[in-house]
Amino acid sequence: MTRTEKLLAELIALPSVNPAFATADGAPAPARQIHGEIRVTDFLAAKAAKAGLDIDFQKVFPDRSNIIVRLLPKNKVQQTILLAPHLDTVGAPDALFTPQRKNGRLHGRGACDTKGSVAAMFTALCELAGSKSRPMDTQIVFVGLVDEEYTQSGSRAFVAQASRLCVPNMLTNGRDARATTLAIVGEPTKLRLVTAHKGSLWLQLETRGKAAHGATPHLGKNAVHEMAKVVDFLETDYAAQLRRRKHSLLGTATVNVGQISGGTQPNIVPAACTISVDRRTLPGETESAVCREIAACLRAKKLTAKVSNTKLAPAPAMETDSALPLVRQFSRSLGQTSPAGVDYFCDAAILAAGGIPSVVFGPGDIAQAHTADEWISLAELERGKNLLLNFLKSLS
C-alpha cells in the first residue's frame, strides 16, 4: 500500500459530511457523528507536525476551520503555490465511511470528491518536505478548505485574508499575484489541467393567478397553466438561444427546470406557482444580467413571471489565462499541450475572483462524485501525486 492510498483510506474513515446535509437522502441517521471537517483537520495537523511543516488554522465557523500547512523555501518567498482541495463531503450512509479496496479501486464517501485530491496533494507536500529538493524561492501551501459543497465559506474566508495568511500582500517584489501565485484547486478532473469552469445560478420564477372554485374555473386565473407556458419557453426557445453561445472550453450555457410547486388541492384554481431553475453560466455572464435577460425574454413572449436569484452566495464561472507563467509551467510539467474546461462549479472561481489565479486538477472522475458507490482508481491516485510532486520539484 502506497503512502497516498493509506492516507486516503484514513481520510475516508474520518467522516466530514457538510453539516448542511444532515443525512443522505432516504438514509437513516448514522450511528456516529459524521458532520463537520474537524476530524480531518486535526488528523492532517498531526501528520503535518510530524513532517516538520508550519501549521495554521483559519476559523470559518465554530468547530470548522480551514487548515493551512506551509513548506517555506530556503530563501525569501518570491512566489506561492497553493494546493487547495476541500475537506467536506456530501452525505452518505454509515457504511460508506469504511473504505473498501476492490479491483484496483478504493471505494468510500469522498474517495474522488475530493479526499483523493487531499491525499495526493498532502502526500506530495510531505514527500517534498522530506527530500533535498525543497524550492529555493517558492513557498508551497496546502489549504484544506471547508464548506465547498454548500456555500464555499472556506474559500471565501480564505481569499478575504489571503495576504495575511500566506500570499504576502498579494504582491511580491513589485509583481502582482498573476505572475507570482497559482492555486491548484483539487477536484476530480481525471488528471487534466482545467482552466475554466461554468458558474451555477439558481433562480426562482413565480406566476400569480386568481383562486376560484374548481367547478367554475372561468372565474379564476390558473397560475399553473401560465407557468406551464413559461416552462415550455425555457426548455425550448430559451434553451435553443443558449446553445447558440459557445465557449471554446466549456461549450454552451444551459438551463434546467428542476422543481415546480403550485396549487393547494384539485378543486381550487391555483393562485400561485413557482419553479426552481438551474442556469449554468459562462465566463463573462453575471447573475444580474441573466435575471434581466430571462425577464426580457418572457416579456417578449407576453409571459409574466417574477424572476429572483435564490443562490445563497455568488457562484460565478471561472476562466484563467493559460498563458500565465505558472500555468504554463504546470502544463509543461504535466505534458499537456492544451487546457480543459468542466461543467461543474468549485472553489477555483472564488479564489480567482479574489485575485488568485486558479486552475483545477486532481485524480478521479466527477461521474463517481456523490454516488452511492463512490470510488477512485488507485493507479490514477498515485499518478496524480507523482505529477504534483514533479511539478513542485521543478519550481525554483
Regions found by a protein language model. Give the residues of each.
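Acidic-glycine-rich active-site phosphate/pyrophosphate-binding loop
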Residues: 88-102, 180, 195-206
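Short glycine/proline-enriched loop/turn "hinge" motifs that connect secondary-structure elements
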Residues: 91, 134, 194-199, 266-270, ...
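Acidic/histidine-rich catalytic neighborhood of metal-dependent amide-processing enzymes
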Residues: 114-115, 119-198, 202, 396
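Glycine/serine-rich anion-binding loops at beta->alpha junctions
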Residues: 105-120, 213, 361
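Residue-level signal for inorganic ion chemistry
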Residues: 11, 15, 48, 187, ...
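Acidic/His- and Gly-rich active-site-bordering loop/insert found
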Residues: 1-111, 130-136, 365
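Metal-dependent amide/peptide-bond hydrolase catalytic core
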Residues: 202-396
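Phosphate-handling active-site elements
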Residues: 76, 102, 124-142, 170, ...
